[in-house]
């Protein structure tokens, strides 16, 4: 019961934030801002729903804007940060896959060429790669993946 209420609240918060964003955000920043909100919503749901696995879900801060405007961008690239890396990597194997890679996209967002390369590399390595556009899709993806442990 509690987890259902939490799920509903998270989805409602995500939807309200997306409506506010569409009404207030400058046009060119909409997709990135929506993806940030989606990522935060997904991460909070995951941490509440699966606290035992929270250390196995990771995000590398390699967002395009961060890399373009961050003074340390060159240093981060030299240290191994790469364009196109999935938004989340879940390092828990199930019966079918050794890990799960999740790319978050806004409703109209599309993969970059670098992200398509990562998708191919993940799938070639035997991992599962999923593109998620809503918090609800993220929940279904994680729950389905964990059913096969």
For the regions a language model picked out, list residue spans one by one.
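Catalytic phosphate/metal-binding cores of nucleic-acid and nucleotide-processing enzymes, i.e., regions
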Residues: 2-149
């Amino acid at each position: 019961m509690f987890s259902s209420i939490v799920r509903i609240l998270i989805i409602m918060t995500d939807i309200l934030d997306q409506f506010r964003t569409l009404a207030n955000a400058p046009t060119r920043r909409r997709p990135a801002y929506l993806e940030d909100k989606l990522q935060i919503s997904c991460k909070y749901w995951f941490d509440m729903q699966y606290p035992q696995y929270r250390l196995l879900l990771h995000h590398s801060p390699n967002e395009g804007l961060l890399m373009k405007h961050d003074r340390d961008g060159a240093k981060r690239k030299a240290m191994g940060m790469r364009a196109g890396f999935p938004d989340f990597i879940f390092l828990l194997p199930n019966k079918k896959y050794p890990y799960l890679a999740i790319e978050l996209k806004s409703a109209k967002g599309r993969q970059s060429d670098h992200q398509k390369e990562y998708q191919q590399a993940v799938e070639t390595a035997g991992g599962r790669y999923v593109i998620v556009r809503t918090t609800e899709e993220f929940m279904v993806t994680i729950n389905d993946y964990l059913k096969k442990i």
